[in-house]
Curated annotation (Swiss-Prot):
Family: Belongs to the SfsA family.
The protein's name: Sugar fermentation stimulation protein homolog
Molecular function GO terms recorded: DNA binding
Source domain of life: Bacteria
UniProt organism field: Aquifex aeolicus (strain VF5)
Pfam families: SfsA (PF03749), SfsA_N (PF17746)
CDD domains assigned: SfsA-like_archaeal (cd22358)
HAMAP family reported in the protein's UniProt record: SfsA
Record-linked InterPro entries: SfsA (IPR005224), SfsA_C (IPR040452), SfsA_N (IPR041465)
Gene3D superfamilies: 2.40.50.580, 3.40.1350.60
Length: 214
């Protein structure tokens, strides 16, 4: 997936879930953060981030990437669906794809033929293990439980798009969200599939470099 033109900046402070301060072109600017996770190891004072200039909206800039020790990391969670869709259009054979499908009071990312897909964006890596979530997510837990509930009608598929390359495996973050962890392992125990996409991030693009089932 191609990225928009990016500019380097220094992260200063996160004001709330959606806005942070960055030092850019000699002054402090407010920048949009499209990610509700904590991102505490990435959005910290003094770290290098890369922003794009937006058209319209309240804030002129949006934080897209942050630098980790061994990898650039994309923190724009909405990109995960685009990355996944680009990947499947190149590698899967299917007849019909629907986006944003509402079922059982939940909205799922894709219905691909008879496969009901929920995609999660992953940014956190600890000791070589990619982990989700990095903040409690009732919505994410609800998605998994509804996937299980609907498994008599659809084939469930849970997808984690890890928007960095410096990891070897994936696990749910049980310490941060025990309820999500419980739902995840219930889903896995029933033999349903979990797909992980590893991405290599550069200043120009994000590429899927490895795909595996957990």
């Amino acid at each position: 997936m191609k990225l928009p033109p990016l500019m380097p900046a220094i992260f200063v402070k996160r004001l709330n879930r959606f806005v942070g301060k960055v030092f850019l072109n000699g002054k402090i600017e407010r920048a949009l953060i499209r990610n509700t996770g904590r991102l505490s190891e990435l959005l910290k004072f003094g770290n290098t981030v890369f922003v794009r200039e937006k058209e319209g909206g309240k804030y002129r800039y949006e934080i897209i990437l942050a630098r980790a020790e061994k990898s650039l990391v994309c923190v724009e969670s909405h990109y995960a669906n685009k990355i996944f869709e680009e990947y499947i259009r190149r590698n899967w054979k299917f007849k019909e794809l629907k986006r944003e499908v509402k079922l059982e009071n939940e909205r799922f990312d894709f219905l691909i033929d008879n496969t009901l897909v929920e995609v999660k964006s992953v940014n956190l890596v600890k000791n070589g293990v990619a982990m989700f979530p990095d903040a409690p997510t009732k919505r994410g837990t609800g998605h998994i439980r509804t996937l299980i509930k609907l498994s008599d009608k659809f084939k469930p598929l849970l997808v984690f798009v890890v928007q960095r390359s410096d990891f070897l495996s994936f696990e749910p973050n049980c310490e941060t969200d025990p309820e999500f962890c419980k739902a995840y392992y219930e889903y896995v125990s029933k033999g349903f599939e979990v797909l992980v996409l590893k991405c290599r991030v550069s200043l120009e693009e994000i590429n899927v470099v490895e795909v595996f089932f957990t």
